[in-house]
Amino acid sequence: MNLELVVQLGSLLLITVAGPLIVFFLFIRQGNL
């Protein structure tokens, strides 16, 4: 398996998962519960 491909897929998965979580976290921190 190509290491670069694994890194790209890992980064894409991380962004896909972390993006909404970061937005949600910032939304909560502003007191909009």
UniProtKB/Swiss-Prot annotation:
It is a single-pass membrane protein. Keywords: Chloroplast, Membrane, Photosynthesis, Photosystem II, Plastid, Thylakoid, Transmembrane, Transmembrane helix. The chain crosses the membrane at residues 8-28. Disulfide bonds: none annotated. GO terms for biological process: photosynthesis. It is found in: Plastid, Chloroplast thylakoid membrane. It comes from the Eukaryota. GO terms for cellular component: chloroplast thylakoid membrane; photosystem II. A core subunit of photosystem II (PSII), probably helps stabilize the reaction center. Belongs to the Psb30/Ycf12 family. PSII is composed of 1 copy each of membrane proteins PsbA, PsbB, PsbC, PsbD, PsbE, PsbF, PsbH, PsbI, PsbJ, PsbK, PsbL, PsbM, PsbT, PsbY, PsbZ, Psb30/Ycf12, peripheral proteins of the oxygen-evolving complex and a large number of cofactors. It forms dimeric complexes. This is Photosystem II reaction center protein Psb30. It comes from Euglena anabaena (Euglenaria anabaena).
